[in-house]
Curated annotation (Swiss-Prot):
Cellular compartments per GO CC: plasma membrane
Alphabetized NCBIfam families for the sequence: lepA (TIGR01393), small_GTP (TIGR00231)
Entry keyword set: Cell membrane, GTP-binding, Hydrolase, Membrane, Nucleotide-binding, Protein biosynthesis
GO molecular function: GTP binding; GTPase activity; ribosome binding; translation elongation factor activity
Protein name as annotated: Elongation factor 4
Top enzyme class: hydrolase
Function as written in the Swiss-Prot or TrEMBL entry: Required for accurate and efficient protein synthesis under certain stress conditions. May act as a fidelity factor of the translation reaction, by catalyzing a one-codon backward translocation of tRNAs on improperly translocated ribosomes. Back-translocation proceeds from a post-translocation (POST) complex to a pre-translocation (PRE) complex, thus giving elongation factor G a second chance to translocate the tRNAs correctly. Binds to ribosomes in a GTP-dependent manner.
Length: 598
């Protein structure tokens, strides 16, 4: 294959700016997929992606155009899935920057463009949705130049929906994106594993980009970090259906199957090379991202524990950013502490467990990872609030802080600043983007944005704001643990860590909310919030009262009192041994006790 005719590129875009539609048009125009087989969001293979209208998993497809071979690596646009984007960029030489002509640049697009520029990628600005009456391509061009600092005078104006000027995009890919550098088939194999997925018949299938050398069916290869060794049993490319090949060469993007059965044997981001002719240095992999949100997953039926474990292993194959470890809760039994990149990421995984593996589970309220220094100088990482040591053993607690970048219309700046201040934010900067839009920068505790920050931001700004963040490190905070007691018993899974200033109001809100969602039982249930031994709030869930006197007809009043007394004694006994049924809503109640809404 002539290496000068290969082009590897990604598409960078914010949610709803038309990335999946552009990918569909490219597949249609190049006849990679026949028109009769083409369906909307063709590269989005998960049902969840089509339903929500977002791309979650990256996908890679080979396209033939004239006498060129393109590898299009489709990427997600939501802030939680930045790790998928970083992997796509590591496998590309260039990127199409797709911007909605009616919306302009959004915060997430900005973050991904900077990521691409740091990787030395060639950027092609493309402005979409020019068919809409409210589009303003000239203003968007100006914004691209001023905000990102790249020349947009020859930005391509397209409508992915109608197919207008799509051919110009393909021509620009040929002219502007360089062919793969140093793509020599005779060098030792050097290939980046940028994704993997699980196939029930073939085991783990790797998606790879070959930088140097070649690999043939039957070759023995190994992962340079983990040193795990395998034989290549099948190779091929996606068009988007899988097409088998005897070999993959330098510059190509394809898939590799090696009968790998254990998910833990694969490390996405690693370099593979041949066992009998290894390359000296691995590729610089993309940064491995650490989870930022942790939650407990507990199967409703304890017999599903092993199935849950197996499912998490399979999902972590195609989603290497998930972490999980076994966890035990007095209230909920055996489960796992699972780490995610954000709340959407968590929702998607929960949905996948339910759909793909039929597992019903209870998810505890999400938490972030706190760094606790004890009085004897030991440093603990705590992501489960119930494990926080007693106050007298703690020297200091540090929590993760983020730098939030919010792009919004100027009329909402005041309201959003007020919300950020209420969430313990520290103002950093207010940048003028154009006549109507501003970029607001705040440092905020991650625990304050984890729950509903994004939803609140959208509702405050009528959906016009966009938001991106990066973690800047840990800072000391005055935090305390609030325990929840039901019927006098601490429920470990309901504990929360909050700032001292908000402890009383959060405790009060939580007891009120739990009273609403926990069903009434045959006995009275006190719901208490406590800091240490001190109860700071209390509500009572009233008992159902069974009418034990209904069968009496007239007769002696003492008979009536005797039956009521007997019922009371029975309830007392039930109270001492009675366990309270806790529905999933009780854990979600923690998310709805945000004091800044008041």
């Amino acid at each position: 294959m002539d290496k000068s005719k290969i082009r590897n590129f990604s598409i960078i875009a914010h949610i709803d700016h038309g990335k999946s539609t552009l990918a569909d048009r490219i597949l249609e125009l190049t006849e990679t997929v026949e028109k009769r087989d083409l369906k909307a969001q063709h590269l989005d293979s998960m049902d969840l992606e089509k339903e929500r209208g977002i791309t979650i998993k990256l996908n890679a497809v080979q396209i033939k155009y004239k006498d060129y071979v393109f590898h299009l690596i489709d990427t997600p646009g939501h802030v939680d899935f930045t790790y998928e984007v970083s992997r796509s960029l590591a496998a590309s030489e260039g990127a199409i920057l797709l911007v909605d002509a009616t919306q302009g640049i959004e915060a997430q697009t900005l973050a991904n463009v900077y990521l691409a520029m740091d990787n030395g990628l060639e950027i092609i600005p493309v402005i979409n949705k020019i068919d809409l009456p409210s589009s303003d391509p000239e203003a968007v061009k100006k914004e691209i130049e001023e905000v990102i600092g790249i020349d947009a005078s020859d930005a391509i104006l397209i409508s992915a929906k109608t197919g207008k000027n799509i051919e110009d995009v393909l021509k620009a890919v040929i002219e502007k994106i360089p062919a793969p550098k140093n793509a020599d088939d005779n060098k030792p194999l050097k290939a980046l594993v940028f994704d993997s997925y699980y196939d029930q018949y073939r085991g783990v299938v790797l998606l790879i980009r070959i930088f140097e050398g070649k690999i043939k069916v039957g070759d023995e290869f190994f992962f340079m970090q983990s040193k795990n060794k395998f034989h290549a049993t099948e190779l091929g490319v996606r068009k988007p259906v899988e097409l088998k090949k005897d070999s993959l060469e330098a510059g190509e993007v394809g898939w590799l199957s090696a009968s790998i059965r254990n998910a833990k044997d694969v490390s996405v981001g690693d370099t593979i090379t041949l066992y009998n002719n290894p390359t000296e240095k691995p590729l610089q992999g993309y940064k491995k991202l650490k989870p930022v949100v942790y939650t407990g997953f507990f199967p409703i039926d304890s017999q599903d524990y092993d199935d849950l474990k197996e499912s998490l292993i399979k999902i972590s194959l195609s989603d290497s950013s998930i972490s999980f470890e076994p966890e035990t809760s007095k209230a909920l039994g055996f489960g796992f502490r699972v780490g995610f990149l954000g709340m959407l990421h968590m929702e998607i995984l929960q949905e996948r467990l339910s759909r793909e593996f039929n597992i019903d589970l209870i998810a505890t309220a999400p938490s972030v990872e706190f760094h606790v220094t004890t009085t004897n100088g030991e440093m603990l990482s705590i992501s489960n609030p119930s494990l926080l040591p007693e106050k007298n053993y703690i020297q200091k607690i540090e929590e993760p802080y983020i730098k939030a970048s919010i792009i919004l219309p100027k009329e909402y700046v005041g309201a959003v600043m007020e919300m950020c201040q209420g969430k313990r934010g520290v103002y950093q900067d207010l940048e003028f983007l154009d006549e109507n839009r501003r970029r607001l920068v705040y440092n905020l505790p991650l625990s304050e944005i984890v729950f509903d920050f994004f939803d609140r931001l959208k509702s405050l700004t009528k959906g016009y704001a966009s938001f991106d963040y990066e973690i800047i490190g840990y800072l000391e905070s005055d935090l305390i643990k609030v325990d929840v007691l039901l019927n006098g018993e601490k429920i470990d899974a309901l504990a929360i860590i909050v700032h001292k200033d908000f402890a009383y109001s959060r405790g009060r809100d939580l007891t009120v909310k739990l009273k609403e969602v926990i069903p009434r039982q045959n006995f009275e249930i006190p719901v208490q919030a406590a800091i240490g031994a001190k109860v700071i709030a209390r509500e009572t869930i009233k008992a159902y009262r069974k009418d034990v006197t209904a069968k009496l007809y007239g007769g002696d009043v003492t008979r009536r009192q005797k039956l009521l007394k007997k019922q009371k004694a029975g309830k007392k006994r039930m109270k001492s041994i009675g366990s309270v049924e806790i529905p999933q809503e009780a854990f979600l109640a923690i998310l709805e006790t945000d004091v800044t809404k008041k």
